[in-house]
Amino acid sequence: MEVATDQPRWMAHHAVLNGQHPDSHHPGLAHNYMEPTQLLPPDEVDVFFNHLDSQGNPYYANSAHARARVSYSQAHARLTGSQMCRPHLLHSPGLPWLESGKTALSAAHHHNPWTVSPFGKAPLHPAARGGSLYPGTGSSACPSSSHSSPHLFGFPPTPPKDVSPDPGPASPPSSSRLEDKDSIKYQMSLSEGMKMEGGSPLRSSLAPMGTQCSTHHPIPTYPSYVPAAHDYSSGLFHPGSLLGGPASSFTPKQRSKSRSCSEGRECVNCGATATPLWRRDGTGHYLCNACGLYHKMNGQNRPLIKPKRRLSAARRAGTCCANCQTSTTTLWRRNANGDPVCNACGLYYKLHNVNRPLTMKKEGIQTRNRKMSNKSKKNKKGSECFEELSRCMQEKSSPFSAAALASHMAPMGHLAPFSHSGHILQTPTPIHPSSSLSFGHPHHSSMVTAMG
């Protein structure tokens, strides 16, 4: 019978938390407090929030329970220390392993104001930072700092050694119910929270709140380890270091300088004044490329008289083989005596060291259709691929000219993270952004809803 009575209460309260209850804001309050007349009766609210006081500390009506809680807190502080935080599972109202709404609410709100997570962050939605759960506390300089950690990174309470909970009157149902609505509505898992934080433009409005809260917490908040946008693009790609900039103008100057230095040179062997590469002989004199290579390979100077050209096939028309007396061959060779022989007789003598027998003589010349080897095929394919790649690069090089790249890289110092232009590189955004970041596009609310 107890379950039957608790179920309609939970269903009614869950409907209010989901936003089905009409919201009416008090005109005289800056925070989003709701009229007490439109809230649930205090006896129904006590079903879920009877363990919290106005300071957010556990409240127990029975003195025996309070003494047990204090002794447990002191023992827990001695064991763990005031600087130890133990992560637990994130609270989400839609998880199937939560048996009842009462367990979810008690786990989500059982946090003290001095239990501060070093990774605590403000809620991402602007409505979640409108009011505070505990309006009467003097230490809450940041409105949503004391209960922002359960939204993304929840930690169990770790009380200090010298602090004990102060029992006080129960909190008014208006502020508790409003904060319950915000926390249930905007709780999310870790992956969703990180995705929203990386892409949501609302982080810039939350930065001043995080800086104010960092001075009041015993544990400092996690700093941003990614530099700002203007620091990132200062030395990475300077427009002057790209193609066509001042660095590329160094090449023609160097070439002209080398040409001017080599104008008075002359090869000491052949007297040439123009050569692709100047060399030196053993005494330090300049040689042209041809004479220098000849001297390096043969150890003597290159002869100035050109050697006689080999006799052409027409001039050797009357030549016949000394072995088989044939006059048609693809290549003339010489035997040991120096006499000309045909290709077949010369190869036979070279292989068997005897003269080729006349019975093997044939009227026609047998030729083979040589197949292209795999190595030459690979070399040919590689050269073709390289030529095709170079041709494609030349065709597509116009959009990536130096002027286009310089125009892309120039405004990167003040580029906003949500710009929709076609930049090659986008500036990284820090995890905790500074308040100086500005977002120039007015349609970020639709982006947040689409990403969520």
Curated annotation (Swiss-Prot):
**How is this protein annotated for GO cellular component?**
nucleus
Q: Which InterPro entries match?
A: TF_GATA-2/3, Transcription_factor_GATA, Znf_GATA, Znf_NHR/GATA
Subcellular compartments: Nucleus
Q: Name one Pfam family in it.
A: GATA
Sorted UniProt keywords: Activator, DNA-binding, Metal-binding, Nucleus, Repeat, Transcription, Transcription regulation, Zinc, Zinc-finger
Compositionally biased spans, kind Pro residues: 156-172
Where mainly found? nucleus
Determine if Zinc-finger is one of this entry's keywords. yes
- Write out the ranges of the annotated region (Disordered): 130-182, 426-452
State the tissue distribution: Expressed in the developing ventral blood island, and in the embryonic nervous system.
One GO MF term: zinc ion binding
Question: Mind listing the GO biological process terms from this record?
Answer: cell fate commitment; negative regulation of transcription by RNA polymerase II; positive regulation of angiogenesis; positive regulation of miRNA transcription; positive regulation of transcription by RNA polymerase II
> Which Gene3D superfamilies does UniProt cross-reference here?
Erythroid Transcription Factor GATA-1, subunit A (3.30.50.10)
Zinc finger spans (GATA-type) are: 267-291, 321-345
Give the superkingdom in one word. Answer: Eukaryota
Which residue intervals are annotated with compositional bias (Polar residues) in the record?
426-438
Q: Where is the composition biased (Low complexity)?
A: 139-151
Protein name listed in UniProt: GATA-binding factor 2
Name of the encoding gene: gata2
